[in-house]
Amino acid sequence: MAARCSTRWLLVVVGTPRLPAISGRGARPPREGVVGAWLSRKLSVPAFASSLTSCGPRALLTLRPGVSLTGTKHNPFICTASFHTSAPLAKEDYYQILGVPRNASQKEIKKAYYQLAKKYHPDTNKDDPKAKEKFSQLAEAYEVLSDEVKRKQYDAYGSAGFDPGASGSQHSYWKGGPTVDPEELFRKIFGEFSSSSFGDFQTVFDQPQEYFMELTFNQAAKGVNKEFTVNIMDTCERCNGKGNEPGTKVQHCHYCGGSGMETINTGPFVMRSTCRRCGGRGSIIISPCVVCRGAGQAKQKKRVMIPVPAGVEDGQTVRMPVGKREIFITFRVQKSPVFRRDGADIHSDLFISIAQALLGGTARAQGLYETINVTIPPGTQTDQKIRMGGKGIPRINSYGYGDHYIHIKIRVPKRLTSRQQSLILSYAEDETDVEGTVNGVTLTSSGGSTMDSSAGSKARREAGEDEEGFLSKLKKMFTS
């Protein structure tokens, strides 16, 4: 039980299901939240309040100014108050609706409302019937908590004794729902919609279009202008973006006087917002375009030239403007049979002969932009890397180029001529750092090695004992 009175109003918490009986006429049980009280005798607040303790507070009764509480000689009066029963008292907390703590700042409240309003906007949740209700609840909560006066009143009395449409100094019963159109509230705060048409505002909630583009390795590394087919919302070609059917006229909007803006009274505040009748155009379309239906924009299939920046990677997504819209393109880069990529660096293999590895020389390697002359130092080992600075991929978010690393691979022949085999056997005789054995070479007791007689005689017949072969020269070079 609670009672609060002032010179202007009296707020009494009435017990249900039955009001206290008064001699002459008794109060009837409330029907559908409406109470009619006919009082024909003296009424005092203590006597009336004492009868409420048995049932407990369940309803709100507001007695308006001019009611005599201690006694009156004038005719019986009628006090009729529309109110909700215990259900409104269980309304979800505004702070919980916005997901903010009770001590949240105005910046936090605005940020929470913005994020949730975008998430539950009816235009982005057309298949969810509860989205519109949730969107309205968010507007209702933000309308109260964004006003410091209303917020203090809500913190003190809660939704049961607060009317968001009233001013900070006036109290009345709870009406429920926001006093401003949720759509208008959203536009006013976050729409940036003072001079745009309603069709343009709708595009804010369109899902971004995503496309996949196939690229070769070289196209991704060096960049390319590639023609691409997209479906985008662009200016309607039939009405040229005007929205009305060609040959027809538009009507002046009398709702906003042609200004495109309307004034909304929200109690102690006056708010200027986009006209709900014409959507900010200042005019009404009588005969909408049959293609865009008055929006001024229509979905069109267009072939556009997409400038692919040099250095994009596989799976990378970029945002590109196309007409008045933006699209997202995810690149799928094919693997190269020559190059391997590591950021801005590329790697490739270069096969050289045994002679090139031993004696050194030059070789030609395929580069990303041109053929590269590679210098092979003597004694090059397999898998040794040779760095070619600045021959890699452009750095997409920086300056300069990556490097090209060439991995040396020594190509060993699978088949030898008799001459080549004899020369290799001659070279193997003088090798001392061999672990294991070599076919055709026999180890001696002193630790040296000699060719087998059959292999040696055959080699001498073909090569000639007095002829110095290629590998013999190599042997002298390494043993001298």
Swiss-Prot record:
**What are the GO MF terms of this UniProt record?**
ATP binding; DNA-binding transcription factor binding; GTPase regulator activity; Hsp70 protein binding; IkappaB kinase complex binding; NF-kappaB binding; protein kinase binding; protein-containing complex binding
Q: Which locations, inside or outside the cell, does it occupy? A: Mitochondrion matrix; Cytoplasm, Cytosol; Postsynaptic cell membrane
Q: Enumerate the Gene Ontology biological process terms.
A: activation-induced cell death of T cells; cellular senescence; mitochondrial DNA replication; mitochondrion organization; negative regulation of apoptotic process; negative regulation of canonical NF-kappaB signal transduction; negative regulation of cell population proliferation; negative regulation of programmed cell death
Q: Which parts of this chain are annotated as the region Disordered?
A: 443-471
How does this chain sit within the bilayer?
Answer: Peripheral membrane protein
The residues that the entry says bind Zn(2+) 2 are 253, 256, 275, 278
Zn-finger region bounds: CR-type = 223-301
Omega-N-methylarginine found at = 58, 238, 293
Which parts of the sequence belong to the J domain?
Answer: 93-158
Q: What is the first-listed, main subcellular location in coarse terms?
A: mitochondrion
Q: Keywords for this entry?
A: Acetylation, Apoptosis, Cell membrane, Chaperone, Cytoplasm, Membrane, Metal-binding, Methylation, Mitochondrion, Phosphoprotein, Postsynaptic cell membrane, Repeat, Synapse, Transit peptide, Zinc, Zinc-finger
Q: Write out the PTM section of this UniProt entry.
A: Tyrosine phosphorylated.
Modified residue annotations for N6-acetyllysine: 134
Q: Which residues carry this modification: Phosphoserine?
A: 398
- Which SUPFAM superfamilies does the UniProt record give? Chaperone J-domain, DnaJ/Hsp40 cysteine-rich domain, HSP40/DnaJ peptide-binding domain
Expression across tissues: Widely expressed with highest levels in heart, liver, lung and skeletal muscles. Also expressed in keratinocytes; expression level and distribution is altered in basal cell carcinomas.
Q: Which GO terms describe its cellular component?
A: cytoplasm; cytoplasmic side of plasma membrane; cytosol; intracellular membrane-bounded organelle; mitochondrial matrix; mitochondrial nucleoid; mitochondrion; neuromuscular junction
How it assembles, according to the record, is: Interacts with JAK2, HSPA9B and IFN-gammaR2 chain. Interacts with Ras GTPase-activating protein 1 (RASA1). Isoform 2 interacts with MUSK (via the cytoplasmic domain).
Q: What does this protein do?
A: Modulates apoptotic signal transduction or effector structures within the mitochondrial matrix. Affect cytochrome C release from the mitochondria and caspase 3 activation, but not caspase 8 activation. Isoform 1 increases apoptosis triggered by both TNF and the DNA-damaging agent mytomycin C; in sharp contrast, isoform 2 suppresses apoptosis. Can modulate IFN-gamma-mediated transcriptional activity. Isoform 2 may play a role in neuromuscular junction development as an effector of the MUSK signaling pathway.
Q: What is this protein called?
A: DnaJ homolog subfamily A member 3, mitochondrial
